[in-house]
Amino acid sequence: VLSIETEKPVFENGKSSLSQIQIRGGAFGYIAPSIRRWQKLGEHTGLSVDASFIRADGNYPFTLENGKYITQEKRNNSDIHTWQGEANLFHTFHDESTLDVKAYYFYSERGLPGAVILYNPKAEERLWDENFFTQARYKKTFSPKWTLQAQAKFNHSWNKYEDTDVKYENGKQTDINRQDEYYLSAAVLYQPVKGLELSLAQDGFINTLHTNINDSPNPVRYSSLTALNARYQWGRIKLSGTLVGTFITEEVKAGNTPDDRKRL
């Protein structure tokens, strides 16, 4: 099982805050400043904020060979600009239960240089990406035998592709896609005796997809996952088993609605 957790602020020597600023640079207009701030808001509360920016021209040189003709060219439409920010709040309650809250944002705009075509250096394809999510996790240990963990998350993804060319109607092609996800999860861990662990988890998802394509179904999907897990360890012997129940239903604004799916 892979478990990844955000790094929590660590304050040493009685400090209540920590700041870090970094700037990196390189060829072809590359520059990447970033900042980090850790702040202690109270005896049981900490905050971390990270932000960064990246830009580059990307117009690197290359040699183009066309029979006996050799020319020195530069890559066009290779620029990129990205912005990224993240904030995390960590709190420990008096009963030792914990609450972690995260908010994350990413935005980028970049050119797509395309293929190298003789006598036609034109490249005007552009791509924009945006991602935002916020999530919260609560964990409480009631006793050495019982532990509860609950999570909630909202995730938003958006991208836009645009190309300008005479081959398109009105001289431009624009594609826009947006996906959103709403997620809830709760899990209970029970350890009745040493070496034996029983857990029950329930996950629920709502996923939406919207595009500007004509007659797009723009589906909405509802998903439910229920998992019962048992694990036993005795010395070097490890036994585990999992039972998962899945239910998925969908709605569409155009076209045929898929059948519900159930699996155990």
Which ranges hold each PLM region?
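Residues that define the transmembrane beta-barrel architecture of outer-membrane proteins
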Residues: 24, 29-33, 79-83, 128-132, ...
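Structural signature of Gram-negative outer-membrane beta-barrels, strongest in the C-terminal barrel
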Residues: 193-203, 207, 211-264
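Transmembrane beta-strands of outer-membrane beta-barrel pores
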Residues: 23-27, 53-57, 105-109, 154-158, ...
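Residues on the lipid-exposed face of transmembrane beta-strands in outer-membrane beta-barrel proteins
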Residues: 6, 33-39, 87-91, 134-140, ...
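N-terminal periplasmic accessory domains that precede
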Residues: 1-22, 31-36
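Flexible loop and strand-edge segments within Gram-negative outer membrane beta-barrel domains
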Residues: 56-62, 72-84, 90-149, 154-180, ...
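Membrane-embedded beta-strand positions of outer-membrane beta-barrel proteins
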Residues: 19-23, 49-51, 87-89, 101-103, ...
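Outer-envelope beta-barrel architecture signal
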Residues: 15-19, 31, 43-47, 83, ...
